[in-house]
């Protein structure tokens, strides 16, 4: 009887953990498609003004001229 009780409790914990992780995965997928994501962000083309490398489409900003190269 003790063995059956332990197996039952283990199965309940595994089911709960699986359901919980599924909910978290959906939330994580939603966050990765956020507008701030690198894949959906807008960028400045070559020759446009920039302050840092991550603003340029090719990810290179000239510090001397403050333009994307």
From Swiss-Prot:
Disulphide-bridged cysteine pairs: 43-57, 50-61, 56-68
Instruction: Give compartment(s).
Output: Secreted
Q: Which GO terms describe its molecular function?
A: ion channel inhibitor activity; toxin activity
User: Which tissues carry this protein?
Assistant: Expressed by the venom duct.
- InterPro entries referenced in this protein's UniProt entry, alphabetically: Conotoxin
Q: Organism's domain of life?
A: Eukaryota
Q: What are its GO cellular component terms?
A: extracellular region
The principal location of this protein is: secreted
The similarity comment for this entry is: Belongs to the conotoxin O1 superfamily.
Further remark, if any?
Answer: This precursor corresponds to allele E1bii. Has not been merged with other alleles since they may differ due to geographic variation (see strain in PubMed:19606224).
Per the record, the domain comment is: The presence of a 'disulfide through disulfide knot' structurally defines this protein as a knottin.
Q: What is this protein called?
A: Conotoxin Eb6.14
